[in-house]
Amino acid sequence: ECDALQRFKVKHQWAEAFGTSHHRLDFGLKLWNSIFRDAPEIRGLFKRVDGDNAYSAEFEAHAERVLGGLDMTISLLDDQAAFDAQLAHLKSQHAERNIKADYYGVFVNELLAVLPDYLGTKLDFKAWSECLGVITGAIHD
């Protein structure tokens, strides 16, 4: 569903978890290292950005771009027209890359596993699950 209250919670919890500046890099490294640990085959999607080394400047920059896209998408949760346009843009970007549907689930699961490290018991797991389902569903369907 990702109703108005869930969107509000996700938007505000994301701002707290993702933070600013160098904190974002740490968040990204934690997330991507978790993804690569649990689904090492995903690393192959990132060959052109030195995905074999999550600490390389090239991969860190790419990881920040990906999370920047998620940041923008989450920030638009309360503006349906802009949110829909962002999802359409992300869908076109991801269609070119032939990303398996399963990989979106891996991303969501790993993100949900990392968020408690930043939000603790404030994490609204249901709100995040619902809203991430809407986001990833629109991108890969």
From Swiss-Prot:
<dbReference type="GO" id="GO:0005576">
    <property type="term" value="C:extracellular region"/>
</dbReference>
<feature type="domain" description="Globin">
    <location>
        <begin position="1"/>
        <end position="141"/>
    </location>
</feature>
<dbReference type="InterPro" id="IPR002336">
    <property type="entry name" value="Erythrocruorin"/>
</dbReference>
<dbReference type="GO" id="GO:0005833">
    <property type="term" value="C:hemoglobin complex"/>
</dbReference>
<keyword id="KW-0349">Heme</keyword>
<dbReference type="GO" id="GO:0019825">
    <property type="term" value="F:oxygen binding"/>
</dbReference>
<dbReference type="GO" id="GO:0005344">
    <property type="term" value="F:oxygen carrier activity"/>
</dbReference>
<feature type="binding site" description="proximal binding residue">
    <location>
        <position position="94"/>
    </location>
    <ligand>
        <name>heme b</name>
    </ligand>
</feature>
<comment type="similarity">
    <text>Belongs to the globin family.</text>
</comment>
<protein>
    <recommendedName>
        <fullName>Globin, extracellular monomeric</fullName>
    </recommendedName>
</protein>
<keyword id="KW-1015">Disulfide bond</keyword>
<dbReference type="Pfam" id="PF00042">
    <property type="entry name" value="Globin"/>
</dbReference>
<comment type="subunit">
    <text>The giant hemoglobins of worms are formed of a monomeric subunit and a disulfide-bonded trimer. This subunit is monomeric.</text>
</comment>
<keyword id="KW-0813">Transport</keyword>
<dbReference type="InterPro" id="IPR014610">
    <property type="entry name" value="Haemoglobin_extracell"/>
</dbReference>
<keyword id="KW-0479">Metal-binding</keyword>
<dbReference type="GO" id="GO:0005506">
    <property type="term" value="F:iron ion binding"/>
</dbReference>
<keyword id="KW-0561">Oxygen transport</keyword>
<dbReference type="InterPro" id="IPR009050">
    <property type="entry name" value="Globin-like_sf"/>
</dbReference>
<keyword id="KW-0408">Iron</keyword>
<feature type="disulfide bond">
    <location>
        <begin position="2"/>
        <end position="131"/>
    </location>
</feature>
<dbReference type="InterPro" id="IPR044399">
    <property type="entry name" value="Mb-like_M"/>
</dbReference>
<dbReference type="GO" id="GO:0020037">
    <property type="term" value="F:heme binding"/>
</dbReference>
<keyword id="KW-0964">Secreted</keyword>
<dbReference type="InterPro" id="IPR000971">
    <property type="entry name" value="Globin"/>
</dbReference>
<dbReference type="InterPro" id="IPR012292">
    <property type="entry name" value="Globin/Proto"/>
</dbReference>
